[in-house]
Amino acid sequence: MARYLGPKAKLSRREGTDLFLKSARRSIQDKAKFDSKPGQHGRTSGQRTSDYGLQLREKQKVKRMYGVLEKQFRRYFEEADRRRGNTGANLLFILESRLDNVVYRMGFGSTRAEARQLVSHKAITVNGQSVNIPSYLVKTGDVIAVRDKSKKQTRIAEALQLAQQVGIPAWVEVNADKAEGTFKKVPDRDEFAADINESLIVELYSR
């Protein structure tokens, strides 16, 4: 399936939650009413979603949030299932370790899509080496930086300024002046994505 290129606010409306696909420069609540589905008439009241429907919707929500397609998402799940510990939490830890997500968390991109573009356009280095693979999995202690020739991009400066206002997650350390940061650790489950019910995804793939 091809990557979705349509209106981002429509996806957040469909899922009934902010998927953080738009920059925080403008509140996404101003762009979309989360209490109604896309379409002329919105959500039909009185309809009960099946267990399978809930599981599928949760998977779709997480895929869209992190910008991952089905084939790769399935591979992440299989890897998460092989690891020790909770499969659902492991899945989210893998997603959080993607380079495009770490670039976003550090504030170099205002959205994951923008961060993915920075990686793809070779604007990002890992431990001093250029890496242009958004799905590259960052390890604890890795240093992520914006390449010197890309530091003057207005969008990066604006994203960093915004990130400083909103707050940088505790599991990354960022030097905004140098446009570089360190991936200190994989975050604890209670440190992020409180609105994700990963157990529904595990149930779906365990059918």
Curated annotation (Swiss-Prot):
Regions of compositional bias (Polar residues) in chain numbering: 42-52
InterPro entries: Ribosomal_uS4, Ribosomal_uS4_bac-type, Ribosomal_uS4_CS, Ribosomal_uS4_N, S4_RNA-bd, S4_RNA-bd_sf
UniProt cross-references to Pfam families, sorted A to Z: Ribosomal_S4 (PF00163), S4 (PF01479)
Chain intervals for the UniProt region annotation (Disordered): 29-54
Keywords annotated in UniProt: Ribonucleoprotein, Ribosomal protein, RNA-binding, rRNA-binding
GO terms (BP aspect): ribosomal small subunit biogenesis; translation
GO CC annotations, alphabetized: small ribosomal subunit
GO MF: rRNA binding; structural constituent of ribosome
SMART domains assigned: Ribosomal_S4, S4
Biased composition (Basic and acidic residues): 29-38
Domain S4 RNA-binding: 97-160
Keyword Electron transport assigned: no
Coiled coil (residue ranges): none
Subunit: Part of the 30S ribosomal subunit. Contacts protein S5. The interaction surface between S4 and S5 is involved in control of translational fidelity.
Family per similarity comment: Belongs to the universal ribosomal protein uS4 family.
Function, as annotated: One of the primary rRNA binding proteins, it binds directly to 16S rRNA where it nucleates assembly of the body of the 30S subunit.
Protein name: Small ribosomal subunit protein uS4
Source species taxonomy: Bacteria, Pseudomonadati, Pseudomonadota, Betaproteobacteria, Burkholderiales
